[in-house]
A protein has these predicted regions:
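ATP-dependent helicase/translocase motor core
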Residues: 1-214, 219, 223, 227-242, ...
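Residues immediately C-terminal
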Residues: 75, 224, 292-295, 332-336, ...
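Structural recognition of the conserved hydrophobic beta-strand(s) that form the central parallel beta-sheet
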Residues: 108, 286-289, 329, 355-360
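Conserved beta-strand elements of the Class I
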Residues: 216, 475-477
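Short, solvent-exposed loop/turn elements at domain surfaces
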Residues: 295-298, 401-407, 486
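SF2 helicase catalytic motif II
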Residues: 303-357
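Interdomain helical connector at the RecA1-RecA2 junction of SF1/SF2 helicase-like NTPases
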Residues: 368-472
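Conserved helicase motor "Helicase C" RecA-like lobe of SF1/SF2 P-loop NTPases
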Residues: 481-491
Length: 491
């Protein structure tokens, strides 16, 4: 039976075995009469070591490359990784030795939660993973050395002629965190200071040094994905060579409205095989919306409500292994989500066993909680002080509604919008209502007030255009961007 009284044997049969098989391992019992060559790609149960039998030994190319310690459902697996370490030390004659460990990849699981530890380097820390690595993944890991790649990265000059000093600082901070084996980190840079350029340069350095081969660049909207693809295509990685001439850059399909009419380009759509069957020789960047990746991982129902953009018609659920990407970058990761959306956002990022870098101008609480370490921060005040941003002048636009709120009298005819369906109907107020200034665009909208504010902004923008010959970049911070009652859409 399942639940608190579920035995370890039942947990293994009903939970752990299926998850190993889903990752491509064939679960078989140990047989002393069989040679090691018979166990290639197998999870061998009760595999003998000098410190007792391992629950599962993951075998590749006549060697044990992984050990899985199993516990019943009610026990937390993190604390039993030490048992897997004992088996690793006790598997003498395995042809591998990493400072006394003879098996490099260790797991502990209760069938629901999986903890993993790569013991090849003392700085590596155990971490929770969404599933077991595939045989192909562990084979690839054995052929890669993050320590050597980090050494190569440290020796790689960061001298791109368009880099600003603080952007070099950001790269240095990220690279130091990776060298320390941190897996989640946040880069916070003020709007207008070149976050995307900084990260495109960062991606190139990580790929050139061998720290990363496959990089996922996640954004929130297709238009932002199109801009990111263009940023990679325009980046001159080496003198006379653009990024996409050195490494492949892929994206999802775009709609016409996603593309900047002044900069037309033909995006390369990622072949599905790159996601479901990642190869050690692949080296590419994939730019995707987080909504599409959520569909790819968990199906269309999981992505409901994450965006007001229509679903991509060609998006479907795929069997994507957890090692599909070495680095995942979440751009503009400060966006506010509902509790359900936040859970889906986290699940999507958590699926990948990758270095995760969050990029934002304004770190939200959920962002800092997930990415943990703000490894670099470049704030607006410092950017102004150093001359990279121009300070703003405050212009007061007086609005009685924004100061005093709105008073609606009994019997007034008002439009009522259902925020769920978007349906609108006219109704007569039965009682008078007072809305404070803080309620504007949250509980009640004032179209005339919005119009007057925009007219005032337009006046200053047109003056700027006449003086400098171009319409100024303008950021408008809407109160909300909710389906059917969106202040942003009305503006």
């Amino acid at each position: 039976m399942s639940g608190p009284s579920e035995s370890e044997r039942r947990t293994r049969q009903q939970r752990i075995d299926p998850r190993l098989e889903a990752a491509g391992w064939r679960v078989v019992p140990f047989d002393l009469a069989l040679p090691m060559s018979a166990y290639d790609g197998c999870a061998v149960t009760e595999f003998p070591t000098s410190n007792g039998p391992a629950d599962y030994a993951l075998c590749l190319n006549r060697r044990v490359v992984g050990v899985v310690e199993a516990k019943r459902l009610t026990l937390g697996p993190q604390n039993v990784l030490t048992q897997a370490e004992r088996y690793s030390r006790g598997l003498l004659g395995n042809g591998l030795d990493f400072d006394g460990f003879h098996v490099p990849f260790l797991y502990a699981t209760n069938g629901e939660v999986i903890w993993y530890h790569d013991v090849r380097h003392t700085l590596n820390r155990s971490r929770q993973v969404a599933g077991f690595h595939t045989p192909a993944a562990l084979s690839e890991f054995l052929g890669r050395d993050l320590g050597s790649a980090c050494d190569a990265l440290a020796l790689l000059p960061n001298t791109h002629p368009k880099l600003r000093p603080y952007q070099v600082e950001a790269n240095t901070a990220v690279e130091a965190a990776i060298a320390e084996r941190k897996r989640q980190m946040l880069v916070a840079m003020a709007t207008g200071t070149g976050k995307t350029f900084t990260l495109v340069n960062q991606v190139y350095r990580l790929m050139k040094s061998g720290v990363a081969k496959r990089v996922l660049f996640l954004v929130d909207r297709r238009a932002l994905a199109a801009q990111a693809v263009q940023a990679f295509a325009a980046f001159e990685a080496e003198p006379g060579q653009k990024f996409n001439a050195i490494y492949e850059v892929y994206s999802q399909r775009f709609h016409r409205e996603d593309l900047d009419g002044e900069n037309r380009f033909d995006p390369n759509v990622l072949p599905e095989s790159y996601l479901v069957r990642p190869q050690p020789g692949d080296a590419f960047v994939y730019v995707s919306t987080i909504q599409r990746m959520t569909i790819n991982l968990f199906g269309r129902d999981a992505a409901l409500g994450m965006s007001d953009e229509p679903f991509d018609e060609d998006a479907g659920q795929l069997d994507i292994p957890i090692h599909a990407f070495d680095v995942v970058i979440a751009d503009e990761c400060h966006r506010g989500y509902t509790t359900a959306e936040l859970s889906t956002w986290r699940n999507t990022l958590d699926h990948f066993d990758a270095i995760k870098i969050g990029l934002t101008a304004t770190p939200a609480a959920h962002t800092k909680a997930y990415f943990r370490d703000v490894v670099f921060r470049y704030e607006y005040e410092r950017a102004v002080r150093e001359g990279f941003l121009v300070d703003y002048d405050v212009v007061s636009i007086k609005s009685n509604v924004r100061i005093n709120g709105v008073f609606l009298r009994e019997g007034e005819q008002v439009g009522m919008v259902d925020p769920t369906s978007g349906s609108e109907q006219m109704d007569l107020l039965e009682d008078e209502r007072q809305y404070d200034a803080a309620d504007i665009e949250r509980q009640v909208t004032a179209p005339d007030s919005n119009r007057q504010i925009l007219e005032e902004i337009r006046k200053y923008a047109e003056e700027h255009e006449q003086r400098y010959g171009r319409f100024p970049k303008t950021l408008i911070f809407a109160v909300n961007d909710l389906p059917h009652t969106s202040h942003a859409d009305r503006l």
